[in-house]
Amino acid sequence: MLGNNYAPEFFNGCDPKASDPLKRICEETLEDLQGYKEVLQDFGVEVIQPEMDPNERFLDNPHRYPRGPLQPRDYQLVLGNTCFSSGCDHPAIIKKLQEYGEVTKPQYTVPVITSEEKYNFVSGADWPTWNDFVSNRKNQDFFEDFVWQEALELSSHEWMSSACCFMIGTKLFVGTSAISISQIKPEGTDMLGVDKFDVIFADMVGHSDGNYHPIKPGAILSLRDVQMYEETFPGWDVCYLPDQSWSKVKPFLNLKDKNAGKWWLAGEEDNDEFTNFVETWLGNWVGYVEETVFDVNVLMLDEHHCCVSNPNNAQVNAFLKKHKVEPVYVPWRHRYFWDGGLHCITLDLYREGTQKDYFG
């Protein structure tokens, strides 16, 4: 699956000082998506996309609008050829996935709630304290029956996002917080379907695919030493890019943070700060990102072809050549505006071949 986005007309009727630049971003995003789709098809990939309602308008919704169905990897997990979905994604993504094939709702064998903050938000008056939950979450007898059932239904984990996981042969690498690892002590047996794989948890800030990317057996692109590779990927060759991606766009990300909560919010389309934010992106950042920022959020088409949004990084190109991988340039101008790279905006649903143990 390749993501999709709102058409420029989605912002018809809004104040032009905000809607005009947003329309440009949407138009260029759709152009880049079409180019990406053609690249995928040229390599023999069957591509499906969420379908958009052409009559949908921003002003039709008086409340916060959901982001477009652009990043199908964020709330789905594909293991083998089984697609798990939390059901929290854009309705157009869920609908298209169900049309394509069976979508499986995750079933937890024990409650998994990964932080005290989330626990306090979802827990009822009859639930145990956070510390008692952490100590007893695998002991059903400790809980009232209805509390146990509620906790199972409200369970979630980073492994329910293919953006936080890498399925490499028979191993599933899951990026999660150090607090979650130390307090919850998650295990693959916590969820049906995951228990068939050797699950390895690694401390990670943000999505795994925005921090590092295994490009083929024995080779990894990485922004920094985000994990102890000698333990998780012993003997693999790692290309470190400590000054790329997020660190190169830090001033823009700071501006983006200031506008948190103003995304798709009715009444904010004429907000001067928001308008400045959008115009700053278009005026100062798009060309810079295209030309100088390398994003490890890449997509491997096969063992020898890697989709990249910046073909100009000499260090990366040398590393790819060393491992007999050819970069395939896919323009993706608004990656840091939408917060999704080439990997995030796709979701592998079916791959041929068999799973192997690459670490034996």
Protein language model annotation of sequence segments:
Residues 1-360:
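The feature marks the mature, well-folded catalytic cores of soluble enzymes
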